[in-house]
Swiss-Prot record:
Entry's Gene Ontology BP terms: glycogen biosynthetic process
Entries under CDD domains matching the protein: AmyAc_Glg_BE (cd11322), E_set_GBE_prok_N (cd02855)
Reactions catalysed, as given in the entry: Transfers a segment of a (1->4)-alpha-D-glucan chain to a primary hydroxy group in a similar glucan chain
Species, as recorded: Nocardia farcinica (strain IFM 10152)
Entry function: Catalyzes the formation of the alpha-1,6-glucosidic linkages in glycogen by scission of a 1,4-alpha-linked oligosaccharide from growing alpha-1,4-glucan chains and the subsequent attachment of the oligosaccharide to the alpha-1,6 position.
Biased composition annotated in UniProt, kind: Basic and acidic residues: 7-23
Name of the protein in its database record: 1,4-alpha-glucan branching enzyme GlgB
Stored InterPro entries: A-amylase/branching_C, Branching_enzy, GlgB, GlgB_N, GlgB_N_E_set_prok, Glyco_hydro_13_cat_dom, Glyco_hydro_13_N, Glyco_hydro_b
High-level lineage: Bacteria, Bacillati, Actinomycetota, Actinomycetes, Mycobacteriales
Record-annotated active site: 424, 476
Length: 744
């Protein structure tokens, strides 16, 4: 049937031609343009196989190809080039179940591959809902790069699924060495309004380097590393790396014991380590063997690692993280790090990790302005920038950002069996005016508390403690914020423990003084006992105290080398006896002279010096006695585990106190912080009999003068210090003596 006549045709005396229905093109020009620009929000509606009145239309994106065919049941069907690297044709197969794409490149090989645009999304509706609500605690199971293997009619298909959150992006494409970093073969689809983009790329497997080419809302195109990359290139290279894991863990018994352990009522002596400078040149597996041997011989219960999440700048010590889900490639693969943790667990050593959720660097290839807008960072510079460090601050009030961080905590615990997280820079998170002068914005109540950060920290601790009893969370928090280690159900932040920065500052300041002046500052050494049970504390002498001109424990001590060594030993004995767990940075356990530098190893040669070797021996014995003596750790968090004997003898610079164990044990700890010998210092004691000298830091084995009590002191019926009996104790200058009470 002909169409209606056009009056214009009659005017010109022309006979109208029959009108035919014009067939639609195999690809709409708008789709071609969007695919070419990398800004198509749903390329899967164009590419792949789709129903057609004459069968099935197959569209393939193969820029630079000379010929493209579709192989169905062993028969190749050629596709036509329709422009912009897209090839298409209608195949006479109404129900096309499976096929392969055959691509010929000029002067190159013929490549046969499955079509990634035929596969369904790897995230379900529940996943997307939980991400939007900020409640997907296993976020790493669905975002990031995951090697997969599918069974199809034409055989198995291996590849990698990629998924990334970028809600304001105009388009996202996976680029990598699989496509020569061209960025025009793997456009991703936006999954509804979730902000998640996803694609499956066949024949891409472990070891493939990749990034996301993000067309931002600001009009810029930036190649970003994957926020959930599980492995990375070796810095300074910045690509993410596809990886899987086939590691078989051997620490089931360790994890079972951990679940039933209360860390606050258990011994905890922590050796803080920077892996790159402990013994330079070692990988994770070599470090595991050598570090485990060292730590076990020294008697520590745990190691705490400066951040191992990937960071491009070594001089940041790991505190400017760009890949929160990837152990640094400097020392090996993720499975190598798993082996590191597993080996330490096998040696009876827990592994704590320094974790940095407060801020992240501005590198544009990482998290910064990820989709062309402030995405992970708070949009208001008064809240979103940390001026002191030149970094961005996470937007803790945004569901997806909070989810990213909370899930990351579970990731390290579940994927790498980490025993605890030391949370860095908590004070900077809690206060809106932290280091901001007058340029800060109050909260909705007009206060300076960051309510979103408080909610995040509470959620973090609730999630970790619910999912993994026995795992510790430790706050580096330097203010008097109340209830840092109290339960969230009573308004606290929910941390297991908190660093006692006040103890560290006061103690190091006191002992840096010449002994002749210490009596005028006696309150500095006693003040920490006023608030010792207000929180569950860790006493830290960390990396921060041995850098930037602060000196070391050795150089802080007054006097000649003999006096310095005595001062270090006395300090450590005081630290181990004080209520709270203890953390000591590497090198300080043998009194290293030089400040720490991440660019060089420790000065192990100093152990050839008897004084430095003596400090190391003293630390070994401190740990041995500490672990064997419940009085020193079982009641750290209750005043019932402590009592003063002598707090006020400022003239002779002597302190003495009792520690009580939940098993009924009692230890008296006596300290002489003067430069004089107190040959017969009388100490009041609660129990009559022979008290065993279980530690004396002036022992000759430690490099001391050998002043001691011959292993035992005997009480006399002389009331003293409000106690029914007493004994005289020989106290060398700058020394500590621990005495164990007789047991009934």
């Amino acid at each position: 049937m002909s169409g209606p006549e056009d009056p214009a045709d009659r005017r010109h005396g022309e006979v109208p031609a029959p009108r035919r229905d014009i067939p639609r093109p195999l690809v709409e020009r708008r789709d071609l343009m969007l695919l070419a620009a990398g800004t198509h929000r749903d390329p899967h509606t164009v590419l792949g196989a789709h129903p057609h009145p004459d069968g099935t239309v197959v569209r393939v994106l193969r820029p630079h190809a000379a010929k493209v065919s579709v192989r169905v049941g062993g028969v190749d069907h050629p596709l036509d080039s329709v422009g912009y690297g897209v090839f298409a044709a209608v195949l006479p197969h109404p129900e096309l179940m499976d096929y392969r794409i055959v691509t010929e490149y000029p002067g190159g090989p013929t490549v046969i591959a499955a079509d990634g645009f035929r596969f369904l999304p790897t995230l379900g509706e529940l996943d997307l809902h939980l991400i939007g609500e900020g409640r997907h605690e296993h976020l790493w199971h669905v975002l990031g790069a995951h090697p997969r293997r599918y069974t199809t009619l034409d055989g198995p298909v291996s590849g990698t699924s990629f998924a990334v959150w970028a809600p304001n992006a105009r388009g996202v494409t996976v680029i990598g060495d699989f496509d020569g970093w061209s960025g025009n073969t793997a456009p991703m689809r936006a999954l509804g309004t979730s902000g998640v983009w996803e694609v499956f790329v066949p024949d891409v497997g472990s070891g493939t380097k990749y990034k996301y080419r993000v067309h931002g809302a600001d009009g810029r195109v930036v190649d970003h590393a994957d926020p959930l990359a599980f492995a990375t290139e070796l810095p300074p290279a910045t690509a993410s790396v596809v990886t899987g894991s086939d590691y078989t863990w051997q620490d089931a018994q360790w994890l079972e014991r951990r679940r039933s352990t209360d860390p606050t009522r258990s011994p905890m002596s922590v050796y803080e380590v920077h892996l790159g400078s402990w013994r330079p040149g070692l990988g994770y597996r070599e470090l595991a063997e050598q570090l485990a041997d060292y730590v076990r011989a020294a008697g520590y219960t745990h190691v705490e690692l400066l951040p191992v999440a990937e960071h491009p700048f070594g001089g940041s010590w790991g505190y400017q993280v760009t890949s929160y889900y990837a152990p640094t490639a400097r020392f090996g693969s993720p499975d190598d790090f798993r082996a590191f943790v597993d080996h330490l667990h096998g040696a009876g050593i827990g592994v704590l990790l320094d974790w940095v959720p407060a801020h992240f660097p501005r590198d544009e290839w990482a998290l910064a302005r990820f989709d062309g807008t402030p995405l992970y960072e708070h949009p208001d510079p008064r809240r979103g920038e940390q001026l002191d460090w030149g970094t961005y601050v996470f937007d803790f009030g945004r569901n997806e950002v909070r989810n990213f961080l909370v899930a990351n905590a579970r990731f390290w615990i579940e994927e790498f069996h980490i025993d605890g997280l030391r949370v860095d820079a908590v004070a900077s998170m809690l206060y809106l005016d932290y280091s901001r002068g007058e340029n800060w914005e109050p909260n909705i109540h007009g206060g300076r508390e960051n309510l979103e950060a408080v909610a995040f920290l509470r959620e973090l601790n609730d999630v970790v403690h619910r999912a993994h009893p026995g795992v510790v969370t430790i706050a580096e928090e330097s203010t008097t914020w109340p209830g840092v280690t109290r339960g969230t159900e009573v308004g606290g932040l929910g941390f297991t423990m908190k660093w006692n920065m006040g103890w560290m500052h006061d103690t190091l300041g006191f002992l840096a003084r010449d002994p002749i002046h210490r009596s005028w500052h006696h309150n500095e050494i006693t003040f920490s006992l006023v608030y010792a049970w207000s929180e569950n504390y860790v006493l830290p002498i960390s990396h921060d105290e041995v850098v930037h001109g602060k000196g070391t424990l050795w150089t802080r001590m007054p006097g000649d080398d003999f006096a310095k060594a005595a001062g270090v030993r006395a300090l450590l004995a005081y630290m181990w006896a004080h209520p709270g767990k203890q953390l000591l940075f590497m090198g300080q356990d043998f009194g290293q002279f030089r400040e720490w530098s991440h660019d060089r190893g420790l000065d192990w040669g100093e152990l050839d010096n008897p004084l430095h070797r003596g400090i190391a021996t003293a630390v070994r014995d401190l740990n041995r006695v500490y672990r064997a003596t419940p009085a020193l750790w079982s009641q750290d968090t209750t005043p019932g585990g402590y009592a003063w004997i002598e707090a006020d003898d400022r003239d002779r610079n002597v302190l003495a106190f009792l520690r009580y164990g939940s098993d009924g044990s009692t230890v008296a700890c006596v300290f002489n912080f003067s430069g004089a010998l107190h040959g017969e210092y009388r100490v009041g004691l609660p129990i009559a009999g022979e008290w065993t000298e279980i530690l004396n830091t002036d022992a000759a084995d430690y490099g001391g003068s050998g002043v001691g009590n011959y292993g035992v002191v005997r009480t006399e019926e002389i009331p003293w210090h409000g106690r029914p009996v007493s004994a005289t104790v020989a106290l060398a200058p700058n020394s500590a003596v621990w005495l164990a009470a007789p047991r009934a």
